[in-house]
Amino acid sequence: MAKGVRIIITLECTECRTNPNKRSQGVSRYTSTKNRRNTTSRLELKKFCTHCNRHTVHKEIK
C-alpha cells in the first residue's frame, strides 16, 4: 500500500516559546492536516493564541 498524501501536523505558537511575560502558563498548539505534495516546507499560519490572548504566528513542529 502507498503512503497517504495528507499528514497530521502540529502548529505551535512562536511567541509563547520565547516570551516568559504572558497572560498564562503553557504553549498554544493546534493540529491540522497538510498535503505532503503541495506543501513540502514547514507550514506557518496566523492563529489565535489563548495564552498570549491575541493572533500570533504558529509554526509547524515535528
UniProtKB/Swiss-Prot annotation:
It comes from the Bacteria. InterPro entries: Ribosomal_bL33, Ribosomal_bL33_CS, Ribosomal_bL33_sf, Ribosomal_zn-bd. GO terms for molecular function: structural constituent of ribosome. Keywords: Ribonucleoprotein, Ribosomal protein. One of its GO terms (cellular component) is ribonucleoprotein complex. It holds the Pfam family Ribosomal_L33. GO terms for biological process: translation. Belongs to the bacterial ribosomal protein bL33 family. This is Large ribosomal subunit protein bL33. It comes from Trichodesmium erythraeum (strain IMS101).
